[in-house]
Amino acid sequence: MRKAVLTILFLVWAVLGSFADGIAITHGPYLQNVGESEATFVWVANKPSIGWVELAPDDGTNYYAVERPKFFDTTNGVKNTSTLHSVKVKGLKPGTNYRYRVYVTEVLSHKSWVVTYGRTDALDVFYGQPPMFRTNDTKKGETSFAVVNDIHARVGDITKLMNVANYKQKDMVIFNGDMLSNLTSEEQIFTGFMDESIKLFAKEKPLYYVRGNHETRGEYATMCQKYFSPKEPHLYYMFSQGPVCFIMLDTGEDKPDTDLEYSGITDYDNYRNEQAEWLAQVVKSEEYCRAKWHVVVGHIPPRPVKDMWHGQYEVLRKFVPILNEAKVDVMLCGHLHRHIINQPDNEVKFPVVVNSLDHVISGWTEGQNLHLDMYDTKGTLVEKFTVKAK
């Protein structure tokens, strides 16, 4: 009898243990690279798994009303077995709300053509509402955004600055680099800033990420694009919302590639050469040319000139000549950990707004004006800056 009881208890413990240690979505989902007709979803599971996202229109129906279309995390037609999942969905309509749900199914083994699956986890849409996002719309009359940079894992400042900028009313949020001091692990990305961002807004509000010079450092640095712009060709890119075309530059490191601090692992001078070639082409594109406003976002500024480091010289030499010809309205930067506004001159023919590490830029268009208000964590207005349409 005692042996039978012990056997039953062991089986119960084993079953409960398997449930407790089952597949689960541990981070995310969050949005990346939302455009007029596409959006990318990123999320993390605790076990190797296949993943997919379901999409549903915001049409008033219950999420369970019909089977929703599925979009799988794949590479060349094969579903990826991974803990990190990303899916880019195309064919969406501009200025349209969509609900979504992400899933993971554990892969217990994959031998030859035989795959054994475990349990499935998904976002809860039974007791809660599925997250909802809105695609961009270049026909939208106005737009708004919030920009922070140089957070360096000060998680509490994210919430303060987002609230100060009234983030719930903004179309998008932009992270302009150095959200961490270096990249050493996946967990660091989430505990350092992304978990808080997901809790606040990133499930439903577009987040656009610009790499800073500190995300280029650490043993996990080459994994950066697995989490940010994971389905794009590069970490530099362009997108439009309302009357604004945004160019997001990756300004690389701030010191020469040969500096001892980099241990011979960097090649940013050539990387910026390639990026300059791309930049020269996109500023001639129809999307760029038809936009009313042109905003460049890059971590390292080309100003001020005094005591300029190598990275700033590179931005000034390789990017600024192209941007001068492209009639840029303003460039938003960080990196210097202080608030500076450089007015246009003969060398840089557009204003450069350098945002401090503990400030947020609250930006919005209004007719012929592009407003940029800078606030600190206490909500104190640091400076108002307005750019007039050209």
Label every model-predicted segment:
Residues 17-147, 167, 366-390:
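Acidic, histidine-bearing metal-coordination/catalytic regions of metal-dependent phosphoesterases
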Residues 146-149, 172-178, 205-213, 295-299, ...:
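Active-site neighborhood of phospho(di)ester-bond hydrolases with catalytic His/Asp-centered motifs
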Residues 48, 151-154, 179-182, 213-217, ...:
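Solvent-exposed loop/turn segments at secondary-structure junctions
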Residues 1-4:
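Positively charged n-region of N-terminal signal peptides that target proteins for export
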Residues 262-264, 268, 286-331:
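Active-site-proximal segments of metal-dependent phosphoesterases and phosphodiesterases across multiple
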